[in-house]
Amino acid sequence: MKKKLLDTIIIGFALFAIFFGAGNLIFPPYLGVTAGENWGIATLAFLISDPLLSIIAVMVVAALGGSALNVGRRVHPLFASALAAICVLLIGPIFAVPRTGASTHEIFVQSYFPSAPQWITSLVFFGIVLWITYKENSVMDAIGKYLTPILLFILFCIFVAAIVQPDATFATTDGTGLFAQGFKEGYQTMDVLGAPLLAGVVMKDITRRGYLNKKDQFRMMFGVGIVAFALLALVYSTLAYSGASMSTVIDSTAQRAAMLTTIVKNLLGSWGQLAMGLAVCFACLTTAIGLTTTCGQYFEEVSKGKISYKKTILVTVAVEFIISLVGVDSLINLAVPVLTFIFPIMIALILFSAFDQYVPYDWTYLGAVVGAGIVGLVQGINTLSQLLGGNLLGDTATWIGTFPLATYGLEWIVPTFAGALIFTIATAIVKPKQLEFD
């Protein structure tokens, strides 16, 4: 029992640390500053779209066998493979991991060495990532036993200072659109995209520790999920509160990274800034290690060993290093249109997969993906157009904004279930041959 509890805590800490990356440090304080006295609404939405859905995704994939390919398998095997590959690339070498290296430089290194070039920071950062991830079996232990406790201690010091500060003042806001803002801000962490893939990493580690029975594995996964969620919810809430408590003195239009640095410096002074920098380093490092490992394991799995884990790691880290030189804000802006499109699809698949045994037809999944995908595609194209100074599909995007639940950022919910219902009825009437995938 003691071994199982210890293993649950270690793996839970590791999962928390992998999820809790650069984006997770940057976005909650930003929500707090912009929401002011209504920070709780925005934070609740953020908690739903990130840790809650992410942990649910991990649990669902574990129940389906532990492979990310099981998400979307009932739409079509090729769709499942393509979706998983896209998610791996987004959370790996394209957006999430490069952002960890860029954040380490902008939040920590530049604070003390303003003239230090980005490439030196990235070279050292990704050198460490390569060193740890190259030894695949040591990844979860390295994160859970050593890096996470250090990270939590640093964050604890910051949290205490934020909570006990005597002169906390909250900006007055009307609360309009804060739930939608908080929900969609959670997209940027990309945790929901990575959750199905991380489930495989966690399941592999659980098996390595000697838990071979499926029931024991699921119980372990459930406990790991509870530990990770509790830590994530606590940390996010306190970070958001920290921002809200200083919302009258911080410019809400400032860059997210600069906003975080200012909050901590005001709370703890120069020593606090140093602590925050170290927290960023550890948060970014643990996330980069976890996601890079996931990328290597995924491509080794789908290629049936033809693409080795170590070769994938070498290429992935090299690409991450190059893209990290773009910078945090540029990476965030580039990610918005893509995430706007793919997140509704992923959330729809996770929700339906949670009740997989009660969904009789494969086409029900297809209908849900079509409904969510159309809304996400229109909004993604419009968002990209606006970033480029245009307004392509602006009228259609405005019309979608009138859909039920749009004020909560959930305008895709009704089209998703409508699509699922239409395709279910069509299947029941026509009764086409049901596809069965192993």
Model-derived regions: residue spans:
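Helix-loop-helix connectors at the membrane interface of multi-pass transporters/channels
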Residues: 31, 100-117, 207-208, 288-315
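Hydrophobic, membrane-embedded alpha-helices of multi-pass small-molecule transporters
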Residues: 10-20, 161-166, 175-242, 275-287, ...
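TM-loop-TM module centered on a large, flexible mid-protein loop between adjacent transmembrane helices
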Residues: 68-73, 234-285, 337
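Membrane-interface loop-to-helix entry segments
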Residues: 132-162, 335-347, 367-375
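Membrane-water interface regions at transmembrane-helix termini and the short interhelical loops
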Residues: 62-71, 126-147, 208-211, 321-333, ...
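A generic transmembrane alpha-helix motif of multi-pass inner-membrane proteins
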Residues: 165, 362-438
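Select transmembrane alpha-helical segments in multipass membrane proteins
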Residues: 6-14, 40, 77-90, 120-124, ...
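Hydrophobic, small-residue-rich membrane helices and short re-entrant helix-turn-helix hairpins
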Residues: 135-146, 179-182, 202-231, 248-261, ...
